[in-house]
């Protein structure tokens, strides 16, 4: 009983410090578009990875998302956006900041980059706002 009260206080303190951020409606719509694009790669045997990364981009800004990739696999990083953000670019960097050569796709408010790493490790996906618009984006990725 002596340890019960401090344990309860600790649990309440920790649970109060955890802040969960729900996706906005714009991010949900962007994720829908990203999943639609990623689904097209499913025709080539790619599986959509659980999880997603959403956020907001200002004009001429970028977001970096860290991912762990494995040599021997192939990946597609698919991004959907919402108005007024109409055009994004997707690029990939290794852990030292070198830009990787990717196969690129862009159509309207969707973009994707395909990549097959030679080395396993941490990479960074850059989602770049191209133009003067800002808005929400969502990234999902597929692998095989």
Language-model segments: residues:
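Acidic, Ser/Thr/Pro-rich low-complexity intrinsically disordered segments
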Residues: 23-25, 29, 52-136, 142-144
């Amino acid at each position: 009983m002596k340890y019960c009260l401090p344990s309860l206080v600790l649990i309440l303190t920790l649970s109060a410090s955890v802040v969960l951020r729900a996706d906005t409606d714009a991010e949900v719509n962007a994720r829908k578009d990203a999943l639609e694009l990623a689904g097209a790669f499913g025709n080539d045997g790619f599986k959509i990875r659980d999880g997603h990364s959403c956020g907001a981009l200002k004009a001429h800004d970028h977001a970096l998302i860290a991912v762990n990739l494995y040599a021997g696999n192939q990946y597609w990083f698919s991004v959907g956006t919402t108005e007024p953000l109409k055009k994004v670019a997707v690029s990939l960097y290794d852990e030292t900041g070198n830009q990787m050569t990717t196969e690129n796709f862009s159509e309207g408010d969707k973009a994707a980059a395909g990549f097959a790493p030679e080395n396993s490790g941490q990479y960074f996906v850059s989602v770049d706002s191209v133009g003067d618009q800002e808005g929400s984006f969502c990234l999902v990725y597929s692998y095989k």
